[in-house]
Amino acid sequence: MTYCIGIKTKDGIVVASDSRTNAGLDNVNIYSKMFTYDVGDRTVLIVTSGNLGTSQAVYKTIEKDLEDKSGKKNLNTCEDFDQVAKYIGALNLKHSSPKGMNTDTVLLGSTFIVGGQIKGKPMELFLIYPQGNYIKPADSKPYLVIGEVKYGKPILDRVITPDVTIGDASRCALISMDSTLKSDLTVGPPIDFVVYKKDGYKILSQKCLNI
């Protein structure tokens, strides 16, 4: 299991994810579930929960598409974040449903939180489902969580509002993550933690925390 958080404030975006994967108590590993793309006129932050193989396949395809010079669709060619969400959603659906595999009996789906900003466009935050469709958070509760959400969500419900500052959102995200770490053994450190400031077009702070 995993736990990932994305919070959109009036000042910026906060994203956090744990790094634990497990297939039973005797098979625990550490894998980063965060991808950051920070260059030129755009910053894209991605965290994921679900099938690790699918998530890594999506990340690898994103990187390969960025290196492709043939004009293929990639994060650089997306004109706004709706296009970013559609692009990642299409990759997610493709890798979640490989040809010839019975997806009724094999769980291959991954869920993504994608946030950031393209120059001249507003900041955005999306949740992308295994089927490729996506949603935005409610204006009244501008955050998204995926994975093992039940322990860390109550503090977010109490603190995160449209007027929350990026500092308070950062502290709230860390408390939410710590609550989950203490309550669920399938979620564990290190914690990848990123802060993006509005109209900065680069990551303000990126840390790997052993909390």
Task: Show which residues each predicted segment covers.
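N-terminal nucleophile
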Residues: 1-211
